[in-house]
Every structure is written in structure tokens, then in C-alpha cells.
Amino acid sequence: VASHNWTHGDARKISAAALRAMPEKVNKALISIIGIPTRYDRVPYGVYPAMIKAKVGWSYIQWSVDTYDWRGRSTSLIMSKTKKQFTDGDIVLMHDIKDNTPNTAKVMAEWLYEQGYILLTVDELFAKDGVTLEPDTVYFRCDDGVTTIKK
């Protein structure tokens, strides 16, 4: 489980102090609901530089394949646009705000399995290569190492 920011706000418009307070708020809520905290975040709007500058302390999991499902695209359009993008170690961005996303995720997972891919959690993806997620570091994908933007 990862955070997606306490308010889903644009980190460029939130004070550094408020950004640094987010992990405690998020983890307090997560612990009360599921019993565990998180170590990482997927920053809304992809604006991770503000989070790094504020030294919030999370590892930031971004994406290497964007489905643009939030635009309300059909499953067939999303699949036709994303099929040619996939490589080992990719992280796929999808949202739960559109009705078509669950079906698209199912169709995509089935297609990926047919192509020989194995779907992994973020922890599994990085652990397979022995990568330890570092605080205030951004990760986009992982295959035989890792692509990052450091502190």
C-alpha cells in the first residue's frame, strides 16, 4: 500500500512544513485501518520535485507507462496505445476514478500474462533485483537495476 498524498493536492502549492507532516497523518490513518504504515508515495500530478525539496522522506514510485485512463478512454483505445510501450520492469499508471478502469486492468493483465510478463507488487519488483528503496528518491521502473532521480 502506498500513499497518494493526504489531500491529493499539488505539492507545488503546499508548504514544505505541511508536506513534511503528511507521512505521519497518512501512516496514522493506515495503521488504524490496515495495521501497517507505508514507506512510499505516488505523488499526485507527478510533481515529486517539491516533495524531494521539502525532504518529506518517502520513496516516490512514479510510472513508466501512462494509460491515460482518467481521460475516460475506452479499454480498446488504452490497450492499442499501451501495448507497444511495455518492457520488463515497467510501472503502469492507472486510476480508480473511471468506470472503465477495472475492466481495462483485467484485459491488460490478461494480455500481459499472454505476452509472458509476470505482474508484481512494487515491493516484489524492486526486491527481485535487490534494490532497497531510498527516501527522497524517485523510481520509475526496475529491471536489472533501477532508473531513479536522486535527491
Regions found by a protein language model. Give the residues of each.
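Structured C-terminal subdomain patch of bacterial secreted/periplasmic proteins
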Residues: 137-151
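Catalytic domains of cell-wall/extracellular-matrix polysaccharide-remodeling enzymes
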Residues: 2-140
